[in-house]
């Protein structure tokens, strides 16, 4: 498909911002579509051994002078006798009353994966998979459109995601999976073993970037005899997304075609009784039927096509 070809307009919430790898600090970027309830931002990196402090600001605009309003500042401090985290809001040129959280859940020299989950009334923060703090908004979330990172921090990747629609309303905390750049394990075609098959509740996560001139993208689930009970196939020539059965029958998925050249994507497959539920870029797109015995006999996930992979989890 030509890069000049017209793309159908789709809602901002369907489009995911590509991850940023190894940004130079200080680093600032616009958040595509701004923040809204259900948006997640992940931050992977390392705390330098000499670190005194760093801050992650979710801002209303990006001007340098005057300083923009900051809806939420997350600032770990390592230089005191008792390391802690400061959270605060900056409005109209003034910082408001800060909230101090004892402990940091991080130490100098530690690698980390911090996940910011934005909900209707508050933001929740987890560090390395453990819930750490929550902070009620003092400014409207809809005003936030900029991320700024500064201080003593080495950042490996910044990710922008929508919450998993399969756990909406659940008390479970979202799981943050790291983004990897140029990992040999993610070369396409990519294969992952499923030694125990798939069971209800299991989620397959595939994240990547569509290449410049793509033809197709397929995600296949094979059993121990190399039989392929089901395949998810995106065709860029006719702009269709479909489930393909083992005998070649197609079941088109009627939804906006979200795979576009040089755009980031996230595929989620949830195993449930009687089949698989699909979500793309955080949007549920229905299910396909597969009996439990067939699900348990699956032994391999195989990904092929014109994509660059950043994360595969199953």
UniProtKB/Swiss-Prot annotation:
<keyword id="KW-0677">Repeat</keyword>
<feature type="domain" description="Galectin 2">
    <location>
        <begin position="190"/>
        <end position="314"/>
    </location>
</feature>
<dbReference type="GO" id="GO:0030395">
    <property type="term" value="F:lactose binding"/>
</dbReference>
<dbReference type="InterPro" id="IPR013320">
    <property type="entry name" value="ConA-like_dom_sf"/>
</dbReference>
<dbReference type="GO" id="GO:0097193">
    <property type="term" value="P:intrinsic apoptotic signaling pathway"/>
</dbReference>
<keyword id="KW-0430">Lectin</keyword>
<comment type="function">
    <text>Binds lactose. May participate in the apoptosis of adipocytes.</text>
</comment>
<dbReference type="Pfam" id="PF00337">
    <property type="entry name" value="Gal-bind_lectin"/>
</dbReference>
<dbReference type="GO" id="GO:0005739">
    <property type="term" value="C:mitochondrion"/>
</dbReference>
<keyword id="KW-0539">Nucleus</keyword>
<dbReference type="GO" id="GO:0005634">
    <property type="term" value="C:nucleus"/>
</dbReference>
<keyword id="KW-0053">Apoptosis</keyword>
<feature type="domain" description="Galectin 1">
    <location>
        <begin position="27"/>
        <end position="161"/>
    </location>
</feature>
<protein>
    <recommendedName>
        <fullName>Galectin-12</fullName>
    </recommendedName>
</protein>
<dbReference type="InterPro" id="IPR044156">
    <property type="entry name" value="Galectin-like"/>
</dbReference>
<dbReference type="InterPro" id="IPR001079">
    <property type="entry name" value="Galectin_CRD"/>
</dbReference>
């Amino acid at each position: 498909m030509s890069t000049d070809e017209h793309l159908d307009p789709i809602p901002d919430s369907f489009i995911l911002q590509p991850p940023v790898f190894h940004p130079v600090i200080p680093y600032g970027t616009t958040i595509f579509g701004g923040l809204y309830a259900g948006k997640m931002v992940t931050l992977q990196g390392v705390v330098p051994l000499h670190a005194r402090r760093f801050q992650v600001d979710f801002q209303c605009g990006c001007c340098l002078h005057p300083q923009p309003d900051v809806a939420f500042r997350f600032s770990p401090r390592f230089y005191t006798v008792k390391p802690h985290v400061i959270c605060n809001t900056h409005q109209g040129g003034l910082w408001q009353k800060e909230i101090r959280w004892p402990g940091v859940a991080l130490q100098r020299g530690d690698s980390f994966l911090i996940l910011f989950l934005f909900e209707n009334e508050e933001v929740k923060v987890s560090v390395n998979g453990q819930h750490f703090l929550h902070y009620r908004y003092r400014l409207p979330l809809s005003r936030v459109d900029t991320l700024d990172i500064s201080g003593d921090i080495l950042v490996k990747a910044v990710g922008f995601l929508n919450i998993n629609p399969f756990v909406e309303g659940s008390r479970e905390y979202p799981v943050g999976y790291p983004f990897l750049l140029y990992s040999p394990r993610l070369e396409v075609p990519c294969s992952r073993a499923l030694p125990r098959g798939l069971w209800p509740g299991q989620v397959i996560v595939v994240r990547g970037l569509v290449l410049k001139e793509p033809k197709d993208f397929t995600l296949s689930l094979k059993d121990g005899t190399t039989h392929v009970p089901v395949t998810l196939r995106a065709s860029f020539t006719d702009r269709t997304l479909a489930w393909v059965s083992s005998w070649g029958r197609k079941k088109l998925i009627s939804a906006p075609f979200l795979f576009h050249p040089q755009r980031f994507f996230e595929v989620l497959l949830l195993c449930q009784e009687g089949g698989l539920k699909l979500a793309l870029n955080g949007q549920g797109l229905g299910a396909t039927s597969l009996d439990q015995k067939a699900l348990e006999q699956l032994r391999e996930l195989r990904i092929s096509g014109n994509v660059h992979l950043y994360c595969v989890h199953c």
